[in-house]
């Protein structure tokens, strides 16, 4: 089976998929898709994902979009990040759904206002939107921080794909100025993820390629 990962590595959602594939050593071809040049709006990419968003996993005659769906699919290909027990696997899925519904939107607001707008020349951050983002961030961070107390990982005491999913937005913690000072459990847990070889490999891929 031939797989291609179409992604923009600096994006947390692209990073999520790339880091899972790297950790599991899933054979694939990586296709760098430059968001800054509008690659996602081309007819070729739209055929893979009509939403015109990254990342996308492309197989032989099929494609899969939504970063958590891709990450979980990759975790089924090799053992290591997805429990075999049905209840434990449901717990992983539960936290990945939470990442999509609560954690990612909270982080994404701050990332957009404090980093993306400036990067793309979209002007300064909107204070009202930043305040909304901070409210959402603190609400979600309190849940995550409390859950991590006494735990090394999100689910069942072992590293799972849920850790990669929830940890991915934190690669933007510095430029987006995430207020993590009140959340020591998140900082401790994230330090473990950041030390993973696959995490470091994916971070290195996030460097924008130089023009030819």
Predicted regions and their residues:
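GST-like domain detector, emphasizing the conserved glutathione-binding G-site
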Residues: 1-131
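Residue-level detector of family-conserved "landmark" positions at structurally sensitive sites
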Residues: 31, 67, 183, 203-204
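Conserved beta-strand edge residues that scaffold enzyme active sites
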Residues: 35-36, 162, 207
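Structured helix-beta-strand junction loops
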Residues: 51, 77, 150-151, 196
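Active-site-flanking alpha-helical
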Residues: 75, 169-170, 203
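GST-like fold's C-terminal all-alpha helical module
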Residues: 83, 87, 95, 99-195
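Long hydrophobic alpha-helical segments typical of transmembrane helices together
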Residues: 186-212
């Amino acid at each position: 089976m031939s797989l291609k990962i179409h992604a923009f590595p600096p994006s947390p959602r692209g990073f999520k998929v790339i880091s899972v594939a790297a950790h599991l050593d899933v054979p694939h071809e990586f296709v760098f898709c430059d968001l800054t040049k509008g690659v996602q709006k081309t007819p070729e990419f739209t055929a893979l994902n009509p939403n015109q968003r990254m990342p996308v996993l492309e197989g032989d005659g099929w494609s899969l979009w939504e970063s958590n769906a891709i990450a979980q699919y990759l975790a089924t290909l090799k053992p290591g990040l997805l429990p075999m027990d049905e209840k434990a696997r449901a717990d992983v899925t539960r936290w990945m759904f939470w990442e999509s519904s609560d954690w990612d939107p909270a982080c994404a607001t701050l990332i957009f206002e404090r980093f993306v707008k400036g990067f793309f020349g979209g002007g300064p951050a909107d204070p009202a939107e930043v305040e909304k983002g901070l409210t959402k961030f603190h609400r979600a961070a309190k849940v995550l921080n409390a859950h991590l107390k006494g735990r090394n990982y999100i689910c069942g005491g072992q590293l799972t794909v849920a850790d990669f999913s929830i940890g991915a937005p934190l690669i933007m913690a510095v430029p987006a100025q995430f207020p993590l000072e009140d959340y020591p459990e998140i900082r401790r847990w994230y330090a473990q993820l950041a030390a993973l070889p696959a995490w470091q490999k994916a971070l290195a891929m996030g460097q924008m390629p130089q023009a030819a």
